[in-house]
Amino acid sequence: MVNVVLGSQWGDEGKGKLVDILVSHYDVVARCAGGNNAGHTIVVDGVKYDFHMLPSGLVNPNCKNLLGNGVVIHIPSFFKELETLESKGLNDARGRLFISSRAHLVFDFHQRTDKLRELELAGRSKDGKNIGTTGKGIGPTYSTKASRSGLRVHHLVNDNPGAWELFESRYRRLLETRKQRYGDFDYDAEEELNRFKQYKESLKPFVVDSVDFLHKSIANNEKILVEGANALMLDIDFGTYPYVTSSNTGIGGVITGLGIPPQKIQEVYGVVKAYTTRVGEGPFPTEQLNEQGEKLQSIGAEFGVTTGRKRRCGWLDLVLLKYSTLINGYTSLNITKLDVLDTFTEIPVGVSYKYKGETLNSFPEDLLTLGNVEVEYVTLPGWNQDITQIKKYDDLPENAKKYLKFIEDFVKVPVQWVGTGPARDSMLEKQI
């Protein structure tokens, strides 16, 4: 059985918390895309664990964890994150953590050129705005992957005669193409090569053939949970391009990033923040550049785990959520951070877009259109009540339940979980 957790908006919806709640029922947690460019925090017994690249299933001592072939891996960051988690008590993580031999490697020069590229794009744009990259080298690594010039994990750990010489040769050739593109920037290639030569033996115990690993798990009737990174609106194909990440962050990325056929996927859980946030540039139809937006930002503590950047805030956008649902095929929803809305007397919800006076029938792919739509709202009554101590769905205020029902009716997908606070147990489950 394979179930999937996916972000439905622009990321930061709270996917990790749902995964954390679910992992006790699973044998394997796998990541299928992205790198250390996303982040979430899980609190267990009062201890905060920050995850950026590693699967959050590591908090469950009985769970195996896999970084799939679609993930791009910066080895120094991999070990740094692992050591940080170990320092907080996850001492058995090394025996339960695996990396696909087909995953691509992120080098420091990928990160360097990521930032150079961002500056270059900002200089070209009329408004001086950039894409909003995290600078972690994710985009350049996927670029070298697509051009078939990248290096994969198996290239590094290969013990065949001449394997290291081939790795070194390809590394130098890859670096040279970067320098041809961005100029002869100061960079110590010998230092990085020496580091990777030392990483080789340390990395070997983690490396597996991920296709064999996962399909053996499926054959053994093990339960597999896929932890999506980022979210659908950051998908390279279906997101607000070019203000997106460089991988497929929707259901398609699960299939290609792990080698799992679609017939094996049973449930797709869409994680939806009760309002909308976004980090970086790009159109945001329901954004509130006013006191309401500042209030959402303040109460919701909307700062990125990985970058520390302030998140832009706005009302829930059901046009966007319906589009996300069409593509990912959610079987149920997890509405998170509902408690952030506790003190709002009225809560507007975006239900349609108008452009040049006409209602749009689909989510626009053109940013000039999306950036200039007029959002039509339905205003729902707030509940003006602290819900953080509520332990059962049925005990939620009536207006809170009406808010959730409005979402269900609009996208035609049932709400299964509701987040009512930051704690691990602040999640209500609804029978569906």
UniProtKB/Swiss-Prot annotation:
Reaction equation(s) it catalyzes: IMP + L-aspartate + GTP = N(6)-(1,2-dicarboxyethyl)-AMP + GDP + phosphate + 2 H(+)
Gene Ontology CC terms: cytoplasm; fungal biofilm matrix
Main location: cytoplasm
Binding-site residues, IMP: D12, E13, G14, K15, N37, A38, G39, H40, T134, R148, N230, T245, R309
Cofactor requirements of the protein: Mg(2+)
One term of GO molecular function: GTP binding
Cofactor note: Binds 1 Mg(2+) ion per subunit.
EC annotation from Swiss-Prot or TrEMBL: 6.3.4.4
Parts forming coiled coils: none
Gene Ontology BP annotations: 'de novo' AMP biosynthetic process; IMP metabolic process
Quaternary assembly: Homodimer.
Stored PANTHER family: ADENYLOSUCCINATE SYNTHETASE
Family stated for the protein in its record: Belongs to the adenylosuccinate synthetase family.
Record protein name field: Adenylosuccinate synthetase
UniProt source species: Candida glabrata (strain ATCC 2001 / BCRC 20586 / JCM 3761 / NBRC 0622 / NRRL Y-65 / CBS 138)
